[in-house]
């Protein structure tokens, strides 16, 4: 029975699934908006929310520890960690949570999978228009 299980398996081993979530999180942090399936977006949301919360809390209190922790969770991508600590942590300093939103966006042409746009809340419209495919 599946009591208390909160994540999907995506027919992947655990390491592959965690790597996929880390890659999606890095893409979301870099571009601030990605297009992916609804199931992946729903699994990605708590992962990214935790990363932003850790970055927000440790940006001032213990930046070295925060940077190392985020590097381990995000696959060692230093540019994304720097953006998270320098830009996003300051943007959401007063926000207690709910940093992302999921917008349903129809179905994919090849396999009719439900597609969603995942983006950060309070994102300026003048910021990057490019949408990363995930």
Curated annotation (Swiss-Prot):
Keyword match Ribonucleoprotein: yes
GO cellular component: cytosolic large ribosomal subunit
Ribonucleoprotein recorded as keyword: yes
PROSITE patterns: RIBOSOMAL_L17 (PS01167)
GO-annotated molecular function: structural constituent of ribosome
One of the GO BP terms on file: translation
UniProt keywords, alphabetically: Ribonucleoprotein, Ribosomal protein
Subunit (UniProt): Part of the 50S ribosomal subunit. Contacts protein L32.
Similarity field: Belongs to the bacterial ribosomal protein bL17 family.
Cross-referenced NCBIfam families: L17
Protein name as annotated: Large ribosomal subunit protein bL17
Organism this protein belongs to: Anaplasma marginale (strain Florida)
Name of the gene: rplQ
């Amino acid at each position: 029975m599946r009591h208390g299980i909160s994540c999907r398996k995506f027919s992947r081993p655990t390491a592959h699934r965690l790597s996929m979530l880390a890659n999606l999180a890095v893409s979301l942090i870099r571009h601030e908006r990605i297009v992916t399936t609804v199931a992946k977006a729903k699994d990605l949301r708590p992962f990214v929310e935790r990363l932003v919360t850790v970055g927000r809390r440790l940006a001032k209190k213990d930046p070295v520890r925060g940077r190392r922790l985020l590097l381990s969770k995000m696959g060692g991508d230093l540019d994304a960690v720097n953006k998270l600590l320098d830009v996003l942590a300051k943007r959401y300093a007063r926000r207690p949570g709910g940093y992302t939103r999921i917008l349903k966006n129809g179905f994919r042409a090849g396999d009719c999978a439900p597609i969603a746009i995942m983006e950060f809340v309070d994102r300026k419209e003048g910021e990057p228009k490019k949408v990363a495919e995930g």
